[in-house]
C-alpha cells in the first residue's frame, strides 16, 4: 500500500463496496457499524469474522432501522430502548475466556405509525421472514404463534392507539425487538415482545398474557412447565409485591434446533426498587433459588453493583437509590431463562447504568475491579483501556453504558455490557449528509 493511501476499516470497505439503497440506510450504517466494528476489535474478532458480522448487519439489520432522525435529533419512531429513544444497541458479553459481540434493535419502517402499521408490527415480521433461510434450525413457528397471540389487526390497533394518552406506555408496547449474538461463524437470533397492546385491548394482566401464551404452545412447552411454575409462584407472592415486581416482556430463540431442546424462553420482570436486598430477593425468586452457587452469585453481584452503580456512601441494603436520570423506564430489569427439563429458572439482572450508574469511565474502572476479582486476564478483559480505545474520542464518550447484566453459570460470572451509541458522535442528524448514496 502506498504511503499516501488510507487503509479502510471493514465497516468503511463494505460501505464503499456494497453501497446503500437510501440515505437513511447510509445514516444508520454510519451510526451502527462504526461502534460494532470497534467492539469486534476489542473482542479480538478476526478480520474475516468482522466482515461476516458487518455483512449481516448491512443486509438484514440496517434496512430495518427506519428513517433517520429528524434534523433536531428526534427519532422518527420513539422506542423504550434508551432514554433518548435510540432504537439501536451494541453489547459485549464476557464469560470465562471468551468475549462475544451482540446487537439489538427495534425494527422500524417508513410505514410505522401510519394507518397501515399504527403500532409498528410490520418491520419485525418482514425482517424475520427475510432471515428465515439463514441457518439450519432457524424456525419461525414460535414467532408466528406469539404474533398471533399479541399482534393486532391494523384497524383495531389504530383505534386503540388513538385512545392511549400515555405515550411513554405506548413506546413501551414493543411488538418486536430483535437481538443477535455473533459467536464464531454463527448468528443466533432472539425475539422479544411485550403484550402491552393486548393488555390495553383486553384488560388482562401482562404477566397472565405472557404465561398463558407460553402454555398455549402445547406439547412443545411441556418441558418448560416446571421452571415456569416456580416463576409463576414468585410473581404471585407477597415477596414480589413487596419488591414492586411487574412482568414486562418475554423473549425466545428462533434457533429451535434439536427439537426445541436447545431453545430458551426468557421472562423479564421490572421493578422501580433499587435497594440491594430487594435485588437479591428478586434474583433468587424470594429464596426459591438457593445453594452454594447462588451464594457465590450474590457475593459477586454485590461487588459488581458497587463497582458500577453510584451507591451513596453509607446507604443501607434496604434503602433505594435516587436515579440521576429520573425517567419512567429507570427500572431494574431481571430475566429468568427457562430451559426444557430444567427444574428452576436461571436468573439475570440488568444493572441500569444509564439511570443509576457512575460516569462511564468510572464504570469502566469498576469493571476492571470486578474482572480481576473473577481472575479474568485475557487482553479483552482490560476493560478501561479497551473502552477508551473503542469509545473515547477527543475526551468525549461515543457509546454510553446503558446496562450491565449479570448472571452466574457454573463456577463463574456471565457479564454483558450494553451500550447506547451517541448518534451525533457518529452521524449528527443536524449536519450529516450521505457520502456514498448521492
Swiss-Prot record:
UniProt similarity note: Belongs to the tryptophan dimethylallyltransferase family.
Gene giving rise to this polypeptide: janD
Pathway where this protein functions: Secondary metabolite biosynthesis
A Pfam family that the UniProt record links to this protein: Trp_DMAT
Protein's recorded name: Indole diterpene prenyltransferase janD
Broad enzyme group: transferase
Enzyme Commission number(s) from the entry: 2.5.1.-
Annotated residues for binding of L-tryptophan: 80-81
Amino acid at each position: 500500500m502506498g504511503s499516501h493511501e488510507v487503509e479502510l476499516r471493514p465497516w468503511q470497505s463494505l460501505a464503499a463496496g456494497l453501497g446503500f439503497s437510501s440515505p437513511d440506510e447510509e445514516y444508520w450504517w454510519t451510526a451502527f457499524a462504526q461502534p460494532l466494528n470497534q467492539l469486534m476489535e476489542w473482542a479480538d474478532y478476526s478480520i474475516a469474522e468482522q466482515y461476516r458480522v458487518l455483512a449481516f448487519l448491512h443486509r438484514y439489520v440496517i434496512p430495518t432501522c427506519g428513517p433517520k432522525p429528524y434534523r433536531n435529533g428526534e427519532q422518527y419512531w420513539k422506542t423504550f430502548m434508551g432514554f433518548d429513544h435510540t432504537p439501536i444497541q451494541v453489547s459485549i458479553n464476557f464469560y470465562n475466556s471468551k468475549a462475544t459481540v451482540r446487537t439489538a434493535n427495534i425494527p422500524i419502517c417508513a410505514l410505522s405509525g401510519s394507518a397501515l402499521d399504527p403500532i409498528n408490527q410490520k418491520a419485525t415480521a418482514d425482517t424475520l421472514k427475510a432471515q428465515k433461510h439463514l441457518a439450519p434450525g432457524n424456525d419461525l413457528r414460535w414467532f408466528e404463534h406469539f404474533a398471533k397471540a399479541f399482534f393486532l389487526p391494523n384497524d383495531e390497533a389504530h383505534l386503540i392507539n388513538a385512545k392511549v394518552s400515555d405515550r411513554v406506555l405506548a413506546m413501551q408496547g414493543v411488538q418486536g425487538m430483535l437481538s443477535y449474538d455473533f459467536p464464531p461463524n454463527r448468528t443466533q437470533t432472539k425475539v422479544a415482545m411485550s403484550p402491552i397492546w393486548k393488555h390495553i385491548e383486553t384488560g388482562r394482566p401482562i404477566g397472565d398474557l405472557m404465561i398463558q401464551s407460553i402454555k398455549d404452545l402445547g406439547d412443545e412447552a411441556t418441558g418448560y412447565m416446571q421452571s415456569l411454575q416456580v416463576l409463576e409462584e414468585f410473581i404471585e407472592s407477597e415477596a414480589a409485591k413487596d419488591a414492586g415486581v411487574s412482568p414486562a416482556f418475554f423473549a425466545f430463540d428462533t434457533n429451535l434446533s434439536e427439537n426445541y431442546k436447545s431453545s430458551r424462553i426468557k421472562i423479564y420482570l421490572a421493578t422501580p426498587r433499587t435497594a440491594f436486598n430487594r435485588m437479591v430477593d428478586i434474583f433468587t425468586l424470594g429464596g426459591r433459588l438457593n445453594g452454594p452457587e447462588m451464594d457465590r452469585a450474590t457475593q459477586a453481584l454485590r461487588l459488581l453493583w458497587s463497582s458500577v452503580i453510584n451507591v451513596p456512601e453509607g446507604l443501607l441494603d434496604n434503602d433505594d437509590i435516587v436515579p440521576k436520570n429520573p425517567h419512567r423506564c429507570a427500572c431494574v430489569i431481571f430475566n429468568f431463562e427457562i430451559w426444557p427439563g430444567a427444574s428452576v429458572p436461571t436468573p439475570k439482572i440488568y444493572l441500569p447504568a444509564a439511570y443509576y450508574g457512575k460516569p462511564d469511565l468510572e464504570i469502566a474502572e469498576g469493571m476492571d475491579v470486578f474482572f480481576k476479582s473473577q481472575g479474568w486476564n485475557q487482553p479483552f478483559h482490560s476493560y478501561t483501556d479497551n473502552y477508551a480505545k473503542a469509545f473515547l474520542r477527543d475526551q468525549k464518550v461515543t457509546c454510553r453504558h446503558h446496562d450491565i447484566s449479570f448472571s452466574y453459570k457454573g463456577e463463574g460470572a456471565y457479564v454483558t455490557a450494553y451500550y447506547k451509541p451517541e448518534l451525533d458522535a457518529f452521524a449528527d442528524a443536524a449536519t450529516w449528509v450521505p457520502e456514498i448514496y448521492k
